[in-house]
């Protein structure tokens, strides 16, 4: 990406969020758009794939507090076509320390080229040159970090609670195997004469500064392939697919995003690999539910068990049943707790199993059961469970 594109691209607009959006709002917007335009959900749709890349790029900047700050400050300074010196500024003089802004000191070399180190340099790729220096100044193209990759995986309810190792197939740009990443079929590219191997050319912007863009002749690589590789068309990068075993930790929740450092696309020119982000989807369970670190289950009990009390066996997820004691007069909907039978927490301990009692009413009653219920009704004929209800209704 050119520095001009970086400054002029409105990442807030890409994600559809305001400039004062919170981290949570940015994350929510990104997840919604990423799911909508993910390549797996839009196979063969080139526009959706390009949109997904744009969304991921915006999230990479706005989702990182430091990068977002640098991006906002750079847009403020250069969003209107470049920095304009204040009254009294002459030539290449500059009375504002950009090094303070970008996390590195400004290097001055009498207008013969230079730059800013650290901080935003990783994002801008050497944004500034002093004094409008021409092509060939600066350092040779630096190693470039590989792209981040996002993938999705669907787990069963039990796998999400206990953790699982799953195969994950990913596609990304990697050094072309046919030409060993050189872009040249013979493996011997030559140094680009336009940028003298830097991969960048300078253009004036006024105020004694010049901005750098990727060299149009070598596409920012610093090298030109005399004999372009047929596989990568001289770019040195080709699409590569690989399958790796990914360990999903215990206790993950639905829609959780897991970051695996260094497992993304390989870097360029010896640069580090990007990161892999795995979005986890969890299937529903026919019996158990989940509330945070706790699991939930509804257990039916008879009228007699609820009224008289007793012991009830309760199933657990992947383990032996536990026995809970019902106190006499247990109402329908009461929730009890089986400690340590829930989901795994980050510290390795487990949450609880929340057991909700559901008093069942038989549809067909006959024989001794009917006689017993008739006797119970006669014995409690003087009791009115709705008396307090009507009393409260009158007093309201």
Swiss-Prot record:
Major site of localization recorded for this protein: cytoplasm
Ranges annotated as CR-type zinc finger: 163-241
InterPro entries attached to this UniProt entry: DnaJ, DnaJ_C, DnaJ_domain, DnaJ_domain_CS, HSP40/DnaJ_pept-bd, HSP_DnaJ_Cys-rich_dom, HSP_DnaJ_Cys-rich_dom_sf, J_dom_sf
Binding site for Zn(2+) 1: 176, 179, 229, 232
Residue numbers spanned by region Disordered: 127-149
Compositionally biased region (Gly residues): 127-137
Compartments, as annotated in UniProt: Cytoplasm
Residues holding Zn(2+) 2: 192, 195, 215, 218
UniProt remark on cofactor binding: Binds 2 Zn(2+) ions per monomer.
Keyword field: Chaperone, Cytoplasm, DNA replication, Metal-binding, Repeat, Stress response, Zinc, Zinc-finger
Cofactor(s) listed in the protein's UniProt record: Zn(2+)
Keyword Cytoplasm: yes
GO biological process, one term: response to heat
Disulfide bonds: none
Domain notes: The J domain is necessary and sufficient to stimulate DnaK ATPase activity. Zinc center 1 plays an important role in the autonomous, DnaK-independent chaperone activity of DnaJ. Zinc center 2 is essential for interaction with DnaK and for DnaJ activity.
Subunit structure: Homodimer.
Biological function: Participates actively in the response to hyperosmotic and heat shock by preventing the aggregation of stress-denatured proteins and by disaggregating proteins, also in an autonomous, DnaK-independent fashion. Unfolded proteins bind initially to DnaJ; upon interaction with the DnaJ-bound protein, DnaK hydrolyzes its bound ATP, resulting in the formation of a stable complex. GrpE releases ADP from DnaK; ATP binding to DnaK triggers the release of the substrate protein, thus completing the reaction cycle.
Name listed for the protein in its UniProt record: Chaperone protein DnaJ 1
Source organism (scientific name): Streptomyces avermitilis (strain ATCC 31267 / DSM 46492 / JCM 5070 / NBRC 14893 / NCIMB 12804 / NRRL 8165 / MA-4680)
